[in-house]
Amino acid sequence: MTQTNGRFLCVMVCAVLALAGCGHELKVTRVDAGVVTDLSGRWNDTDSRMVAEAMVKEALQYPWLGNFSQAKGRQPVVVVGTVVNNSHEHISVQTFITDLERELTNSQKVTFVAGKGERDEVRTERKEQAVYASEETQKAPGKEIGADYMMKGTIATILDEADGTKAVFYQVDLQMIDLENNTKVWYGQKKIKKVVEKKRTVF
């Protein structure tokens, strides 16, 4: 074998080894939905669920709930309004709203009614029933239950990053607003701070 051929063979072997080292093995592990999987440091399903649980629990412990029930002799009717994403991330706000709705409904302390999008769909169904459904099964309009309070709020972030380390600060603000007089009967705030470090691999 000539010296030139030997060098060529050596280069080819190194190239093959390098390509083999670039391969990625895909591994998928099925885990319980309740398990915390914080891979990127971004807002995730665990954050959404835990914040919704904590904030609804806090809201329902404040005096407005007891005061209303005592004055009216019934549970207050609550609807969830908009939650605005003011963060630097793409956050599934609808997932968070759904978590809030679940916690409010399952608390059995308030009567929960459908939000605007759902109401529009149901109203369309009633209109179609008036045309296509039999008279004895039609649902008449004008019998909806109006909400007494609306829960709405914002999600914001503050980002700090240096030398491969990133700190993300999430702040969720929610308010319970009396729909009759616009007074805010509860204001809650939940904060989450995450530190994400990028590990450098030395070959």
Residue positions per predicted region:
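Amphipathic beta-strand/beta-sheet edge segments enriched in Tyr/Trp
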Residues: 23-28, 148-196, 200
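Sec-dependent bacterial lipoprotein signal peptides
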Residues: 1-22
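Bacterial Sec signal peptide processing site at the extreme N-terminus
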Residues: 18-42, 202-203
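A short, hydrophobic beta-strand-centered structural micro-motif
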Residues: 54-59, 77-83, 132-161
